[in-house]
């Protein structure tokens, strides 16, 4: 069964297409959009080995001319050096403004490909084909693209909406357990910030820590409800003027933890899980959220096999300093997304640093 979710935007709306074996439909789906014939497929070596030829076959059978480029996996390679490599391949293959870059991979590949597409010739088409749960439910949707700076995550970037997000749930079968858990952090996030029914669904499930224990119908529901939540928020606030900021729940402290551990010790989903635990406790300390609700959230995070404690050796003062480099800082004040009930959050910059410090010391 195919699920189609519309991301309705003033300048360029697009579809999120979710269906088994969808990867084989990539070429036809792109042909339906009447995109130019030149395509640059971007992936990492592991994903390319699993799915690259299938994607290329689908594209070529629909009449596209395909070049490919593989980039090293991992957040620490999400930098301008990798973007330069993409530019070089684009130049070698004479990618014109009608061309399309296709991101086949997780969040790192999606972010870099999107940024390269946003900046090559001042903007060419990009199609997102996410292969991790995290990218499927979050980073592939909404047009945020970017790379890291040595002093902070995603400090260099642009908004550049895809022409299509194509999701094939079957590719999750080759996803390592740790990466599946990382994606579940973003799914839990949607339950806390937007969709109390999704949260209840997750609570009712016995095991969430490995894909093989999660029923296929729950995977379908997770993908559809999470993508719908992201589409709803982005449709109301494309460029983070207000509402879209709620998608950063768990990301403020999470990004600081990622950056301070060199993007090696914890992955993005694990960092977001830690950030959600911290944000939930901050909300409790400020009298905004019930203690039992933060306990429900934390129990769900633990059931998924995600961390709820800071990594050992991470300096709390360094985290507080790193928060000031977060791109969400406004007039020197750190903005936090804090829950008020399951399914509802608020954004505030009125969080005293001593509360942040106290919560982090308790983790």
Curated annotation (Swiss-Prot):
Keywords per UniProt: Amino-acid biosynthesis, Aromatic amino acid biosynthesis, Cobalt, Cytoplasm, Lyase, Metal-binding, NAD, Nucleotide-binding, Zinc
Residues where Zn(2+) binds: 186, 251, 268
Pfam family for this entry, one: DHQ_synthase
Subcellular location: Cytoplasm
Recorded GO CC terms: cytoplasm
Tagged with keyword Nucleotide-binding: yes
Top enzyme category: lyase
Tagged with keyword Oxidoreductase: no
Pathways per UniProt: Metabolic intermediate biosynthesis; chorismate biosynthesis; chorismate from D-erythrose 4-phosphate and phosphoenolpyruvate: step 2/7
GO terms of biological process kind: amino acid biosynthetic process; aromatic amino acid family biosynthetic process; chorismate biosynthetic process
InterPro entries the record matches: Dehydroquinate_synthase, DHQ_synth_AroB, DHQ_synth_fam, DHQS/DOIS_N, DHQS_C
Highest rank taxon of the organism: Bacteria
Enzyme Commission (EC) number: 4.2.3.4
Record: residues binding NAD(+): 107-111, 131-132, 144, 153
Catalytic activity: 7-phospho-2-dehydro-3-deoxy-D-arabino-heptonate = 3-dehydroquinate + phosphate
Cofactor detail note: Binds 1 divalent metal cation per subunit. Can use either Co(2+) or Zn(2+).
Cofactor: Co(2+); Zn(2+); NAD(+)
GO MF terms held by the record: 3-dehydroquinate synthase activity; metal ion binding; nucleotide binding
Function: Catalyzes the conversion of 3-deoxy-D-arabino-heptulosonate 7-phosphate (DAHP) to dehydroquinate (DHQ).
Family named by the database record: Belongs to the sugar phosphate cyclases superfamily. Dehydroquinate synthase family.
The protein, known as: 3-dehydroquinate synthase
Organism classification: Bacteria, Bacillati, Cyanobacteriota, Cyanophyceae, Nostocales
Gene transcribed to yield this protein: aroB
């Amino acid at each position: 069964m195919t699920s189609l979710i519309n991301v309705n935007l003033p300048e360029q709306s697009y579809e999120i297409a979710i269906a088994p074996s969808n990867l084989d439909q990539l070429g036809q789906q792109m042909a339906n959009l009447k995109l130019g014939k030149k395509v640059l497929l971007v992936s990492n070596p592991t994903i390319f080995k699993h799915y690259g030829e299938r994607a290329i076959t689908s594209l070529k059978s629909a009449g596209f001319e395909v070049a490919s480029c593989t980039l090293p996996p991992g957040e620490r390679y999400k930098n301008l050096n990798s973007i330069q490599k993409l530019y070089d391949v684009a130049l070698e293959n004479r990618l014109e403004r009608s061309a399309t870059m296709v991101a086949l991979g997780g969040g790192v590949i999606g972010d870099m490909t999107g940024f390269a597409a946003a900046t090559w010739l001042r903007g060419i088409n990009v199609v997102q084909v996410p292969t991790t749960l995290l990218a499927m439910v979050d980073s592939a949707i909404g047009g945020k693209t970017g790379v890291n700076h040595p002093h902070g995550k995603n400090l260099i970037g642009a908004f550049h909406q895809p022409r299509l997000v194509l999701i094939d749930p079957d590719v999750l079968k080759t996803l390592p357990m740790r990466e599946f858990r990382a994606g579940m952090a973003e799914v839990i996030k949607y339950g806390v910030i937007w969709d109390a029914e999704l949260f209840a669904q997750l609570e009712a499930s016995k095991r969430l820590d490995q894909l093989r224990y999660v029923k296929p119908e729950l995977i379908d529901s997770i993908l559809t409800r999470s993508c719908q939540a992201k589409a709803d928020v982005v449709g109301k606030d494309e460029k983070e003027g207000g509402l879209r900021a709620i998608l950063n729940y768990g990301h403020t402290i999470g990004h600081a933890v990622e950056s301070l551990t060199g993007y090696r010790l914890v992955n993005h989903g694990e960092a977001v899980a830690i950030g959600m635990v911290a944000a939930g406790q901050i909300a409790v300390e400020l009298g905004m959220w019930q203690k039992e609700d933060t306990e429900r959230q934390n129990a769900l995070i633990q059931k998924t096999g995600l961390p709820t404690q800071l990594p050992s050796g991470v300096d709390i003062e360094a985290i507080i300093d790193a928060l000031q480099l977060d791109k969400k800082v406004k007039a020197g004040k750190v903005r936090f997304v804090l829950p008020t009930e399951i399914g509802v959050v608020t954004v505030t910059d009125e969080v005293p640093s001593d509360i942040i410090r106290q919560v982090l010391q308790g983790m």
